[in-house]
Amino acid sequence: MDLPEHLAERCRWLSDQTVPVGDGPVIVWLKSLFRTHENPAVDVGRWMAHHHDRPLLIYHGLDERYPHASLRHHNAVMDAAVDLHRGFKKQGLRYVFHLAREGHRPSVMKRLAGQASMIVTDLFPLPPWTDWVRSVADMADGPVVEVDGHCVIPMPLYGRSVDRPFKFRNATKKLRKQRLQR
């Protein structure tokens, strides 16, 4: 059973497996897509959980030990956590938020990787997030997939970088028009 095209084109698989393994939940690990509607990572997780008869858990964590961490950013993330909790609750989805703090820093994703039948996360192709995702993928028994929810033309679909905005605009005109007319 394949994902619908509009979701499949946004996926970058970090393993050869593309279906959940075992009976554990499908975990959606949110790192940067803090919205409850039109969130392709959550949509992929919901679709996989539903079609493979697995529970769904949406996980969101915050730890201050990363480059350029700031109070302003953390306030925005924690405000988003409140909105996510309310929004996912209205949709009947299980959402958990973990705030790491001194004296309480369990390796939540390591633990979830051992329980999950599959991990879905938002594609954020910058360090240290790329390293974190690779580390979790190496621990996980089931498949791990990154889903682009930031771009109209998904990064896995276009797949290359350009040095000028007009070059990208011209190269993706047809793809952009197709997606906007869906």
Protein language model features and the residues they cover:
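Active-site "lid/cap" and pocket-lining segments within catalytic core domains
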Residues: M1-R182
